[in-house]
Each structure stands twice: as C-alpha cells, then as structure tokens.
Curated annotation (Swiss-Prot):
Belongs to the zinc-containing alcohol dehydrogenase family. This is Cinnamyl alcohol dehydrogenase 7. It comes from the Eukaryota. One of its GO terms (molecular function) is cinnamyl-alcohol dehydrogenase activity.
Length: 357
C-alpha cells in the first residue's frame, strides 16, 4: 500500500522511558476493503498504558501512541465490510488483529493467539507499528471492531473494552455466572468495580474483599455488593470460610493467596486477572484437599467482548470514570501510578485533542 494512500493522524505519544506524552503526527493506513475507519471520541487510560509508556516490561518501541479502550463513530468502511456502516457507534479493545487460523482463533480466543496484534505498540503483519487510541482516528479490520449499544454513553463504555471483558470472560468461561452463586471480588479499583456490576447483573451474590474498611460503603451502598470483607480482619475471614463458588482477584500488588483459598468452597476457583510484578506464593494443600483451582485470564475474544458489551447495554453497565482533557493526560498518568483515580480515567479525545500548528 503506497504512502500516497495513507491518511494523516495526530495524537499523543511517549517518545522515551520518561513516559511523558507529547503531540505526535503520524500516518494510518488507507481503509482497506475489510477495514473500518472511525473518528475517536473517547479513549480510556489503562494501567498497561502507563507501564508501556515507561517501558516497565522492556517491550516498548518508541514512539508509542497508547490506548486500547477506544470508542467513536464510523466514518468510512471498506468495500467488503458487511457489519458496519458510517455513523455506527463502535470500539476497539486490547487487540487489533490475530492470525485467524490457529486453534485459539478458531475457538474464538483470539486473545491467546501466538500472533495476536496489540492495538498499541505492536508490529503489524505489514511490519508497521500499531498506534492506539490517544489519537484522532482509528482504522481496524472489521473482525476486531465492537458495536457499542446506542443506549450506553460512549465515555463510560470505553473502559469496558478492556476492564469489562477482563472480568466478564473468566466469569463466563469458568461457569461463575449462574444466578445464586456466591462470587468474591478482590480489590475495588478499575477492574473490581466493574466486576461487581457484571456479577450482580448475572444474578450472583457478590462479596467484595478489600484491605480497607473505608471502601465498605462504596461497595455495598453504591455498587450493590451483598457483603464486604476486610481481608486483614481474621474473624471476618474465618466466618466467611468455605462460602464462595469463585473469586475474581483483580489486585496487582503482592498479596497472600492462602486466605482467599480459604474462602472458597470445595471445587472453587480463584481467578487471577491482576498481574503482580513479583511471584506470589501458592500453598498447595488447600488445592489438594479441596480440589480448588487457581487460574489466570487475560481480556477476552472478540465474540465474548461483543457479548459483554451487549449485556452491559441490557443492564446499563458502564465504568465509573473521571473524564479528562488531552492536556491533562500526563497528570492523570502520575495520579494513576499512585492509584489516585475513581475508577478509570477517560480522555475526551474529540473535544480536546487538537493537532499542533
């Protein structure tokens, strides 16, 4: 595809390991016959964006335009696109491509494809780098575009494309979505608060598990959790032993697993979706004597992401956000590093991100 066919774009990019974002002009590919192009209206800020901007995992190629919680309105579709039209409300999440032929792709688990292409900071099949949603427009293959229900506000829907499917996918896959089940949610941050909302929509009993008593009212009164446990209170934890069918652990800080395993019923599942930087100690005896499982999960496939968003539309589920302007992004990143956000930053891209003269 020649340069003459590419379209100019602008956004915010990190250009070195300081992680500081600054204006950046670049080119996006022309709209291919199976591509969808859309104007970006809002983009959520995920902790992964911060880690990648600072090259904390040693994987970053600069310049990096972050953003994988992207929503907007379709402006152009390719000749062979069948599912979308100009004016549709759409989004793109954590991935923008995969091989589409491996076992994972054939099973609808594109998120586990060995050749999965991340929406931001990854090498595409044509050897160009992908640039994320901190930008004025996106172009993506039709098969990786998500339709956003008309009744959902786009700013609050944006984080669902990462945070939402990250908690929804393991609930569905591990059968923790049955009405009447008892589900624990560890941590009440960007992932945890959305997990509570989806678990309640599925008809389960939800207990939030936190180190902080201060979050009790927020969890129970505002988010609708059925119960709240302070994990540092031995009596509370003891009284709840053996009561939960599954636990979604959203915490990325190092923390003990033994107390959480104690909360599970026999055959219960502890699902890790947070990613602590240091290894966690895993006690084996509770697993052996209760046939309990500790498993991991990462975002979700395209089909289940669409199912998640559709369920959100049915139950009016959105993330609780702080809407920010593009010129506040670096401050937001500093606050995010200190966990100073309730619960997700979202950039008002369309109204505040303008190209430099």
């Amino acid at each position: 595809m020649g340069k003459v066919l590419e379209k100019e774009a602008f956004g915010l990019a990190a250009k070195d390991e300081s992680g500081i974002l600054s204006p950046f002009s670049f080119s996006r590919r022309a709209t291919g016959e199976k591509d969808v192009r859309f104007k970006v209206l809002f983009c959520g800020i995920c902790h992964t964006d911060l880690s990648m901007a600072k090259n904390e995992w040693g994987l970053t190629t600069y310049p990096l335009v972050p953003g994988h919680e992207i929503v907007g309105v379709v402006t152009e579709v390719g000749a062979k696109v069948k599912k979308f039209n100009a004016g549709d409300k759409v989004g793109v999440g954590y991935m923008a491509g995969s091989c589409r032929s491996c076992d994972s792709c054939n099973d609808g688990d594109e998120n586990y494809c060995p050749k999965m292409i991340l929406t931001s900071g990854a090498k595409n099949f044509d050897d160009t780098m992908t640039h994320g949603g901190y930008s004025d427009h996106m172009v993506c293959a039709e098969d990786f575009i998500i339709r956003i229900p008309d009744n959902l506000p786009l700013d609050g829907a944006a984080p669902l494309l990462c945070a939402g499917v990250t908690v929804y996918s393991p609930m569905k896959y591990h059968g923790l979505d049955k009405p009447g089940m008892h589900i624990g949610v560890v941590g009440l941050g960007g992932l945890g608060h959305v997990a509570v909302k989806f678990a309640k929509a599925m008809g389960t009993k939800v207990t939030v598990i936190s180190t902080s008593e201060r979050k009790r009212d927020e969890a129970v009164t505002r988010l609708g959790a059925d119960a709240f446990l302070v994990s540092r209170d031995p009596k509370q934890m003891k009284d709840a032993m053996g009561t939960m069918d599954g636990i979604i652990d959203t915490v990325s800080a190092t923390h003990p697993l033994l107390p959480l395993l104690g909360l599970l019923k026999n055959k219960g599942k502890l699902v890790m979706v947070g990613a602590p930087a240091e290894p966690l100690e895993l006690p084996v005896f509770p697993l052996i004597f209760g046939r309990k499982m500790v498993v991991g999960s990462m975002v979700g496939g395209i089909k289940e992401t669409q199912e998640m968003v559709d369920l959100a539309g049915k139950h009016n589920i959105t993330a609780d956000i702080e809407l920010i302007s593009a010129d506040y992004v670096n401050t937001a990143m500093e606050r995010l590093a200190k966990a100073d956000v309730k619960y997700r930053f979202v950039i008002d891209v369309a109204n505040t991100m303008k190209p430099t003269p």
